[in-house]
Amino acid sequence: MSTKVLIANRGEIACRVIATCRRLGIATVAVYSDADRNARHVRLADEAIHIGPAAARESYLRGDALLDAARATGAQAIHPGYGFLSENADFADACAAAGITFIGPPASAIRAMGDKSAAKALMAKAGVPLTPGYHGDQQAPDFLRTQADAIGYPVLIKASAGGGGKGMRKVERSEDFVDALASCQREAASAFGNDHVLVEKYVERPRHIEIQVFGDSHGDAVYLFERDCSVQRRHQKVLEEAPAPGMSAERRAAMGQAAVDAARAVGYVGAGTVEFIAGPDGDFYFMEMNTRLQVEHPVTEYITGTDLVEWQLRVASGQPLPLRQEQLAIHGHAIEARLYAEDADRGFLPSTGTLRRLRLPAPSAHVRVDTGVEEGDSITPYYDPMIAKLIVWDVDRDAALRRMSQALADCQVVGVTTNAGFLRRLVNTDSFAHARLDTALIEREQAALSAVGDTDDALWQLAAVAAVASTAGATTDARDPHSPWQAQDGWRLGASAPRVLPLQQGERRHTLKVWTQAGGWRVQCDDAAPMRVTGTADAQGLAVQLGERRWTLQLLRDGDQLYLFGADGQHRFTLHDPVGESDHAVADAGSLLAPMPGRIVATLVAAGTEVKRGTPLVVLEAMKMEHTLQAPADGTVKGYRAKAGDQVGDGAVLVDFDAA
């Protein structure tokens, strides 16, 4: 094998590759952009070399810079990770021309599978089942709509060169087709530099099942069983598990053989994934082949006891596959959840900022955490906002589900908004718990997944106690608890006044009053009867009793944000200044602000138009995806402060708005 490997990637996958290389005694070279100068993968590698500015197209997507870095450091091989140049055939060719091993499939296989239309034709010849659709070169909007009409709705528009859920739209009606096509093509052109699309029949209530395949240069190929990736939003995977629930041995063998046939058809070498759409009737159809390691590969590693990165390194050096098909077996059940910096209650808008607190579950035989960040690092608008992958394993699915729910509850993240609460609710939905899986599961479970009303009422009282305790010097077990200078009870001549604390979580808001008393507090929420809370509390946490329940919670105060961490997860409250709140409940009802830095793609409503709350007004491209910003209330669009093509900063005013 190579003795020094350059990793042409960043974040958690770069750290993942470094870990295996270190175990095998292989030296590693990290590359970094301006934004990643102090990133975790840079700190972990044996060497690191700068390759350009923060923008990916000027750094991680520059094949020439990566090859220069490999030559400068004496790296004999390049591991591309996933994303960026991992499926770029020209880059694979350039590595070969430079005498540097590309740890991936041959360029010919990447080309064959990279164009989805051509790949479909190739799979048809190989006898791999296909969904009905149009995979040709004609791209005129009217022609494609005619094809969609003939196929029958709903249809799926997909970027031919795409992946990762980008450049993909489901269309329900003919009259919506042209607008969906335009949006899909814009996103595809931006993400892949190619706006060519194909149109396919959308299989109702489909499951997304993929097969992990591996080939070597000696002509052998195996499948390492399946992963169920049906739980998605916006065509991006949210939860992945292996093996697929309810998979019969016969269907597993049939799908595995079809995947191996697909790999053999293109002379595949290395790790690859063949993705299928599976219908409720048991039929399955080839969707695409990803010619790289997948984000969700750890669940396969858990159930097979393999290290797929090690397999990649060995196969790339010309060694045969480490195991034959008959030596591979499934052991237990594994589930992966992707912890993202995003706001599930605001359409999954990405969140940027500094990780002022980051506590993830402790790794064990049952829990694995793959991450590219540490406390103090920043989530920037330049790259994917993943914080970590949480992977759990146990002897069966029910046990693995319990472990995942607890792992998500153990996550403590301050500085950005995350999807941890959403993921925990998702894992605990009836549909997921009972394996009623399809790609519409999240849409179907919207009511259960909403965070509105999710917080236990008792936690509001405890949050109020925490707000008092987080004040400097406030603690019921202070050195002299009887000293008047330690009192936080609002005492004044003539009466004992409570602390008045307006607290907010999401759209829910309450005013709480707290009286500090001997051994605890008396807390009133709005006009309800006051409740007695006993125990101890300080700026680090609470150990208290409310009614018949005992609570042990960690506490963190970050400006006006109050965080409670307990056995059921993380709870964030905003503490408002009670002075003048009635006049300033909304920071600025007369405008629509950019939720993150990005580029304006389109303005959707003319100035002067009266709109309803939720009407789409602006399309913003950020973090490789298009995000539609909606009217905050009923009212009139007065005008726009940015036009299509403009770059805007976080918090920039985009629309002047008159609320009705």
Task: Please place each PLM-identified region on the residue numbering.
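Long, charged amphipathic helices and adjacent flexible linkers at domain junctions
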Residues: 323-331, 443-446, 450, 570-594
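Catalytic cores of soluble metabolic enzymes centered on carboxylation/carboxyl-transfer
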Residues: 259, 298-527, 616, 650-659
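Structured functional modules or segments
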Residues: 582-660
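Short acidic-glycine loop/turn motifs at beta-strand connectors
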Residues: 173, 215-220, 279-282, 362, ...
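Structured, non-catalytic alpha/beta "coupling" segments that mediate domain-domain communication
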Residues: 77, 87-94, 336, 346, ...
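Conserved nucleotide-binding/hydrolysis modules and their immediate coupling elements
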Residues: 307, 516-551
